[in-house]
Amino acid sequence: MSEKATEIANLLGPTVESLGLELLGVEYLPAPGGATLRLYIDVPLAEQPDRIINVDDCERVSREVSAQLDVEDPISGNYTLEVSSPGVDRPLFTLDQFARHVGESAKIVLKLAQDGRRRFQGQIVRIDTEAAAVVFSVDGKDVQIGFDNIDKARILPDWVALGLAPQKPNKPGPKKPGHDKKKPSNEPAAGKPRAE
């Protein structure tokens, strides 16, 4: 998270927790016409998977943090507040969140290039707490990336495990009218003499 996003997360985290929810992270996206402030919330880990975030949870958090933001005023200028569940491609904001998803695949964008690249996709292998780093398996080899160098990270959903993988049809679908391929015949077209 950016410094501004971290500042806002520290400010709003206790408010979200007072509602019985967890603030996973904050995205602060400044823009000339007005910034976007996006909060990702979830139910506490102890309540998963029995309970999931719903629209009512997002509305409650939005009302409470809107009032707090009006009083504290950490953002100068206009902004749009968005409160969202993390979704199946959940963003990862902390080392603890990476640790919860060891064994899953993720895609990450780095602040500074490592090994000539800024984008990586691979399986989260382990967390190196001493080095404050995440170890990924990328193209068959382990790559250690410092947590401070991770700009953005998201889980890559396993669509097959979720039962949402697109199904390939076993047979071709119905033909559309007018798309029948006719075999050429040696018969001349109606009303036309045969060329010899």
Swiss-Prot record:
<comment type="similarity">
    <text>Belongs to the RimP family.</text>
</comment>
<comment type="function">
    <text>Required for maturation of 30S ribosomal subunits.</text>
</comment>
<dbReference type="InterPro" id="IPR003728">
    <property type="entry name" value="Ribosome_maturation_RimP"/>
</dbReference>
<dbReference type="GO" id="GO:0006412">
    <property type="term" value="P:translation"/>
</dbReference>
<dbReference type="GO" id="GO:0000028">
    <property type="term" value="P:ribosomal small subunit assembly"/>
</dbReference>
<dbReference type="GO" id="GO:0005829">
    <property type="term" value="C:cytosol"/>
</dbReference>
<dbReference type="InterPro" id="IPR028989">
    <property type="entry name" value="RimP_N"/>
</dbReference>
<protein>
    <recommendedName>
        <fullName>Ribosome maturation factor RimP</fullName>
    </recommendedName>
</protein>
<dbReference type="InterPro" id="IPR036847">
    <property type="entry name" value="RimP_C_sf"/>
</dbReference>
<keyword id="KW-0963">Cytoplasm</keyword>
<feature type="compositionally biased region" description="Basic residues">
    <location>
        <begin position="173"/>
        <end position="182"/>
    </location>
</feature>
<feature type="region of interest" description="Disordered">
    <location>
        <begin position="164"/>
        <end position="196"/>
    </location>
</feature>
<keyword id="KW-0690">Ribosome biogenesis</keyword>
<dbReference type="Pfam" id="PF02576">
    <property type="entry name" value="RimP_N"/>
</dbReference>
<dbReference type="Pfam" id="PF17384">
    <property type="entry name" value="DUF150_C"/>
</dbReference>
<dbReference type="InterPro" id="IPR035956">
    <property type="entry name" value="RimP_N_sf"/>
</dbReference>
<dbReference type="InterPro" id="IPR028998">
    <property type="entry name" value="RimP_C"/>
</dbReference>
